[in-house]
């Protein structure tokens, strides 16, 4: 885990077009991209059932954020929040919710909790709201 400044988080999120941003903590730590990829494999191994309108994209994103909370505390996170959060976007003219993670390499990644896909967030979607 690497300490990252609020300024860096704001700069990275604003650069991809996020205007509605909620940061809940005063200090943040970023996991590595390798951790994020392993986390995706962990979630895929514990996959929950997709139920339209009941357990769909927004519930998957909340579940992933909760699991990230637990995993990062187990990995040694103390005295800071982390940079894995829930994100709303427009993708293919449809609303979608997934996760964004600013990693220790200072790259912002989109994380699809339903598949574990990790991809750079820039150009991935039209981002509307983020909560970290």
Regions found by a protein language model. Name each.
Residues 1-132:
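A structural boundary/capping signal
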């Amino acid at each position: 885990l690497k300490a990252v400044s609020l300024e860096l988080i704001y700069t990275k999120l604003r650069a991809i077009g996020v205007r509605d941003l909620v940061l809940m903590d005063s200090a943040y730590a970023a996991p590595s991209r390798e951790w994020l990829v392993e986390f995706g494999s962990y979630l895929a191994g514990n996959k929950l059932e997709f139920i339209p309108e009941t357990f769909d994209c927004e519930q998957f994103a909340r579940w992933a954020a909760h699991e990230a909370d637990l995993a990062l505390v187990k990995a040694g996170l103390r005295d800071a929040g982390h940079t894995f959060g829930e994100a709303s976007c427009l993708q293919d003219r449809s609303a979608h919710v997934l996760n964004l993670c600013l990693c220790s390499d200072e790259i912002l990644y989109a994380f699809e909790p339903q598949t574990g896909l990790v991809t750079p967030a820039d150009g991935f979607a039209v981002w509307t709201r983020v909560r970290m």
